[in-house]
């Protein structure tokens, strides 16, 4: 039968109340608070007491214990520091799906509830025993004591004396408590690595007492005066107890395993008399000793274990309270100056009811109203007043916010873009983090970002319209401006390549591909002299012309594809084979063959012609059949000769006396123009407003010397060693319609070139060897120019030029972008901007038809019939600076992928062709439309 009573406050059993009435004014109240791990949140196990089996712990619940024959009553406070209650509280918070789980808020709420119950214990108990499950003191308890002292001095002292005046708790007086309660510490476990001897346990208790005393004294938890102290510590009595010998909360599973282990071993038995003979076999006396009696133990250690219990530890302090010397040794003052009261059970119960209602129950009622402003402030702001960390973090974040905003504003220029704004905001964030920390840091950073954004948008924001090179406009957004400006300057050369100039970052296609070159042509003394190829452009017939809407009105129809002559694609592979028997011809001074100087009138009689490289969409069927027939017939003559295996066959037809006119007409739109560049699937009826390409003859072939390369006075900006063109030997075999015409053409060619010994072409019978010089020029935004000798190699000088070097260039995909060797950074990309061609003096014309693949588009010159290049001349084809499809601007890559250099775009191979010169053709005014202009072949 149990020797104690237990009940849940305030339901006191009648028999217990009768026994407590007999104590009169000699009842000591002991409060038990702290931590627990068992399911019933029992902290009374050290005193040999436990709640009923059906007991369920709850936050704010008080379980009372009374042992018969004693003068003390135990109040077991169940708080959020008990593990079962804390676990239930966490589950309730996690089950709230409307609000995300906030650990900081949860911890503050848990601590504030514990502090509220501790305040009740401090005002209703004489002795408080704090139970700790671990073997060490928790330093965070000092913070709890600080909060308790703050709450008592700032809140409770303001309203408790007044509100207790007309209640049963009026006997508590002005201090509103029984006394300065004596705090004791009970540790349920002793360190496992220490010996559990009397000396070790006592030494560990004394050491812990010294540490606790220093911490509480340092933080003024107790002082020399009882009224100003939150708790009291006895100086001459032990106030720390370690349970070193009793297992309070055993693990029954481990006990069962231990019992199983013991049954598996046979206990040792005493030696019998017959075993003495075995002992005589020992080599010396004492070699084998019998076991002593198993019941012998140290009497002193046994007595220490019986006396070293939590009950004996507590009774010393209870006797001090009963004998009236409770404050002796606790404070350096006279005992009668301290406040200590022993009440009867009914008097104490009235005080307990009143304080519980004021401190705990009224706080749970949200509708409770009171006229006492101090008490109302306590009920409303109690939790916020305890959250000192929240105030501390808020103060730090406020300091960091001021520092971050100051850093942002001090570094902000008059006008800046989003990139600068993000950079300044990142610097402001670093400045904020020097001071601001804690849970409100994210909200403070968001507030700082909003303030900085408002400061930026208040007249300091840039226009930030992206240029065609993805550079933002730096002009103020709020100030009207007709022309955008990014502040980025590029160095580019003119159409002829002689003059370099500074160009602003373009914001539209016209600025990029036309306006700059027209402007720099006015200051270039060569551009004004040359005659350029006139690309077909849009000519409006109305004033309200507009750009074509491709998605709605002009889908990519099959009629928009460029048609080729019948049979051309079939013979293309056979016609583009390289000649293995190219004649090696070394020229020392090619300029001696042509003495014509470049003059302002040079180029007025340029042989700019159009060859039938591709047939018009509306060409007559007869012209196509005639063209295809001439190409099919040419390989049939001479196929038995082994020497002509790799030769290009060019069939010479009889000169036509009258140019035939195409039977079908072709009309272009005069009300809608092509907004981008011409590509392979764009509508033939749409023309651009301006040409994005440029084709110009900059002089005779003699201005280029292969010994010296391109000179600086002629082509400026080339890197050293990268200013050479690549020689290209092409072997042709002429096939005439009949012998009469063959003899006629032979005599005509002899008359055209009398007495010419050094020429870049040789004719031996029906074979013709010509030499062409080709250069693929790349130019970076810093104005550096260089030639390429392979798709993945920059020309480094004459040593890089071999016999088949040019074949690698003209018969391979050439990347549109390539890293400039002037810088190691990948962001300096050079772009394929010009193609240099030096034509031979042979009676043939070189034809150019470039095709540039960028993204899903394949851009072309926009002419149905590609241009012819005149003989013995230096031609330069300038490519677009920016490419645009059907209302889709294609920006250059930020950096080049080494594994895929063609990702940014590339020039297709097979852009060159050769055709027989036709003297009867009118070449002065080439147009987009025309008839077939003689026999041609791709090279």
From Swiss-Prot:
Q: Where is the composition biased (Low complexity)?
A: 617-629
Q: Which InterPro entries does this chain map to?
A: SMG8-like (IPR019354)
One Pfam family matching this protein: Smg8_Smg9
One Gene Ontology term of the biological-process aspect is: nuclear-transcribed mRNA catabolic process, nonsense-mediated decay
Q: Which domain of life is it from?
A: Eukaryota
Composition bias type Acidic residues, residue spans: 567-587
Recite the UniProt keywords alphabetically.
Nonsense-mediated mRNA decay
Q: Does the keyword Flavoprotein apply?
A: no
Region (Disordered), start-end ranges: 561-600, 617-645
From the record, what ranges are coiled-coil? none
Q: What does this protein do?
A: Involved in nonsense-mediated decay (NMD) of mRNAs containing premature stop codons. Probable component of kinase complex containing nonC and recruited to stalled ribosomes.
What family does the database annotate?
Belongs to the SMG8 family.
- Which protein, by its recorded name, is this? Nonsense-mediated mRNA decay factor SMG8
- List the source organism: Drosophila ananassae (Fruit fly)
């Amino acid at each position: 039968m149990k020797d104690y009573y237990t009940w849940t406050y305030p339901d006191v059993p009648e028999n217990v109340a009768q026994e407590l009435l007999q104590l009169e004014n000699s009842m000591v109240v002991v409060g038990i608070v702290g931590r627990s791990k068992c399911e019933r949140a029992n902290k009374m196990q050290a005193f040999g007491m436990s709640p009923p089996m059906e007991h369920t712990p709850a936050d704010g619940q008080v379980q009372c214990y009374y042992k018969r024959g004693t003068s003390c009553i135990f109040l077991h406070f169940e708080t959020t520091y008990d593990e079962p209650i804390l676990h239930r509280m966490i589950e309730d918070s996690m089950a709230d799906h409307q609000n995300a789980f906030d650990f900081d808020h949860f911890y503050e709420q848990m601590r504030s509830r514990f502090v509220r119950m501790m305040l009740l214990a401090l005002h209703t108990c004489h002795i408080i025993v704090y139970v700790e499950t671990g073997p060490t003191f928790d330093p965070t308890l000092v913070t709890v004591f600080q909060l308790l002292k703050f709450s008592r001095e700032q809140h409770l002292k303001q309203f408790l004396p007044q509100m207790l005046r007309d209640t049963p708790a009026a006997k508590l007086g002005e201090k509103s408590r029984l006394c300065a309660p004596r705090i004791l510490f009970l540790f349920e476990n002793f360190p496992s690595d220490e010996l559990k001897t009397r000396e070790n346990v006592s030494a560990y208790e004394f050491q812990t007492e010294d540490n606790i005393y220093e911490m509480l004294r340092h933080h003024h938890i107790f002082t020399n005066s009882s009224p100003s102290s939150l708790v009291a510590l006895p100086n001459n009595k032990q106030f720390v107890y370690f349970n070193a010998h009793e297992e309070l909360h055993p693990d029954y599973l481990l006990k069962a395993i231990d019992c199983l282990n013991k049954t598996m071993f046979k206990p040792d038995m005493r030696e019998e008399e017959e075993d003495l003979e075995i002992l005589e076999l020992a080599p010396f006396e004492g070699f084998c000793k019998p076991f002593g009696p198993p019941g012998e133990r140290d009497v002193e250690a046994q007595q220490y274990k019986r006396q070293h219990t939590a009950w004996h530890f507590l009774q010393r302090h209870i006797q001090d309270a009963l004998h009236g010397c409770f404050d002796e040794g606790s404070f350096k003052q006279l005992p009668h100056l301290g406040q200590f009261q022993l009440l009867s059970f009914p008097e104490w119960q009235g005080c307990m009811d009143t304080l519980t209602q004021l401190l705990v129950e009224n706080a749970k009622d949200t509708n409770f109203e009171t006229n006492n402003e101090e008490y109302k402030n306590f009920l409303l702001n109690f939790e916020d007043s305890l959250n000192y960390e929240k105030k501390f973090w808020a103060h730090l974040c406020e300091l960091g916010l001021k520092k971050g905003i100051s850093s942002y504003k001090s570094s902000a220029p008059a006008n800046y873009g989003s990139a600068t704004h993000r950079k300044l905001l990142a610097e402001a964030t670093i400045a904020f983090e020097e001071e601001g920390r804690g849970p409100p840091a994210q909200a403070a950073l968001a507030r700082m970002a909003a303030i900085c954004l408002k400061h930026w948008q208040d007249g300091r924001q840039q226009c930030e319209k992206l240029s065609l090179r993805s550079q933002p406009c730096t002009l103020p957004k709020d100030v009207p401006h007709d022309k955008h400006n990014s502040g980025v300057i590029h160095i580019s050369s003119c159409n002829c390549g002689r003059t370099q100039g500074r160009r602003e970052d373009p914001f539209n296609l016209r600025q990029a591909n036309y306006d700059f070159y027209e402007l720099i042509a006015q200051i270039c003394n060569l551009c004004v002299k040359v005659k350029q190829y006139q690309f077909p452009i849009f000519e409006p017939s109305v004033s309200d012309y507009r750009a074509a809407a491709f998605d709605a009105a002009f889908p990519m129809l099959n009629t928009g594809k460029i048609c080729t002559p019948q049979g051309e694609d079939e013979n293309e592979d056979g016609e583009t084979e390289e000649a293995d028997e190219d004649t090696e011809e070394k020229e020392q001074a090619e300029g001696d063959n042509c003495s014509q100087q470049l003059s302002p009138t040079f180029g007025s009689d340029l042989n700019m012609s159009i060859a039938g490289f591709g047939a018009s969409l509306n060409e007559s069927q007869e012209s196509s059949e005639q063209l295809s027939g001439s190409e099919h017939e040419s390989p049939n003559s001479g196929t038995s000769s082994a020497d002509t295996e790799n030769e290009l066959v060019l069939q010479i037809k009889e000169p036509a006396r009258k140019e035939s006119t195409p039977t079908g007409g072709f009309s272009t739109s005069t009300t809608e123009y092509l907004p981008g560049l011409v590509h392979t699937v764009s509508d033939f009826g749409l023309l651009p407003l301006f040409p994005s390409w440029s084709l110009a003859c900059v002089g005779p072939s003699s201005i280029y010397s292969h010994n010296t390369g391109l000179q600086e006075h002629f082509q400026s900006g080339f890197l050293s060693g990268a200013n050479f063109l690549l020689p290209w030997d092409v072997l042709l075999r002429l096939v005439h319609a009949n012998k009469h015409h063959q003899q006629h053409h032979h005599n005509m060619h002899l008359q055209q070139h009398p007495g010419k010994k050094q020429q870049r072409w040789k004719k031996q019978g029906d074979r013709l060897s010509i030499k062409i010089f080709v250069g693929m020029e790349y130019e970076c935004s810093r104005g550096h120019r260089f030639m390429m000798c392979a798709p993945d190699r920059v020309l480094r000088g004459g040593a890089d030029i071999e016999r088949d070097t040019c074949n690698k260039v003209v018969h391979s995909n050439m990347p549109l972008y390539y890293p400039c060797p002037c810088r190691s950074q990948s962001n300096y990309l050079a772009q394929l901007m010009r193609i240099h061609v030096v034509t031979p003096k042979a009676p043939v014309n070189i034809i150019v038809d470039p095709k540039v693949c960028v993204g899903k588009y394949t851009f072309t010159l926009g002419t149905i019939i590609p241009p012819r290049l005149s003989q013995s001349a230096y031609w330069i084809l300038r490519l677009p600076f920016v490419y645009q499809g059907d209302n889709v601007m294609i920006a250059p890559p930020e950096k080049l992928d080494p594994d895929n250099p063609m990702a940014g775009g590339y020039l297709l191979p097979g852009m060159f062709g050769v055709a027989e010169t036709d003297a009867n053709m009118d070449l002065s005014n080439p147009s987009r439309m025309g008839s077939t202009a003689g026999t041609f072949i791709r090279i």
